[in-house]
Amino acid sequence: MRRTKIVVPIMLTELTELEKVSVSDYLSADIVEWRADFLSADDIFEMAPKFFEKFKESKILFTLRTVREGGNIQVSEKKYLQILQEILKFEPDYIDVEYFSHGPSFAALKNYREKIVLSYHNFDEVPTDLTSRLIKMHEEGTAFVKVAVMPERECDVLDLLQITRDMTLEYGNHFISMAMGDLGRLSRISGYLTGSCWTFAGLENSSAPGQISLKETVEILDLLENELA
């Protein structure tokens, strides 16, 4: 049995695309992530009941990744919060909230801490203050804390692995971390060492640079983790 949960994003750009999605393609995933930021707010609202009905047997993470954090949608604070509040009516298992980009929205959603994946994405670097950011996020008491950063050299990846391990040992097993790009691929399959409890894998199109396919991720983690469970 694997320790690391595999999350597979679904990125739809039009309402009609949901009909073409086969639930069976995602059976190897532990969690399905609806990356809704490729749709307009109105289309998100229209698709939501159909999406949650279609994947009612799956655990669902809802993510609205904004342009500021590497996503595809640019919305006001008010609209960001409105979308998340509307989605919460469908009782997703988890909902991503961008902590440093949308702090006011998180403050309004604190009653949903047990569902929140508090996230921070940096597509430029591994910031020198990453540890302090992780501690600040951890102190908010959410279900998970997620960081994705861009390494410039090999030591950046090793630093992230060590920071994740240190945070897990100190504060518990609710951290999710990854170094993006080809250089960071090791971070996506090393959760059994670092304590990072989720990894993200692509079905076909990846949602982040360096993402490994679902099939390959399952094979690698089964090889690395099955004897450790």
Curated annotation (Swiss-Prot):
It catalyses: 3-dehydroquinate = 3-dehydroshikimate + H2O. The keyword Amino-acid biosynthesis applies. Pathway: Metabolic intermediate biosynthesis; chorismate biosynthesis; chorismate from D-erythrose 4-phosphate and phosphoenolpyruvate: step 3/7. Signal peptide: none annotated. 3-dehydroquinate binds at residues 33-35, 65, 188, 207, 211. Its EC number is 4.2.1.10. It is an enzyme of class 4 (lyase). One of its GO terms (biological process) is amino acid biosynthetic process. HAMAP family: AroD (MF_00214). Homodimer. This is 3-dehydroquinate dehydratase.
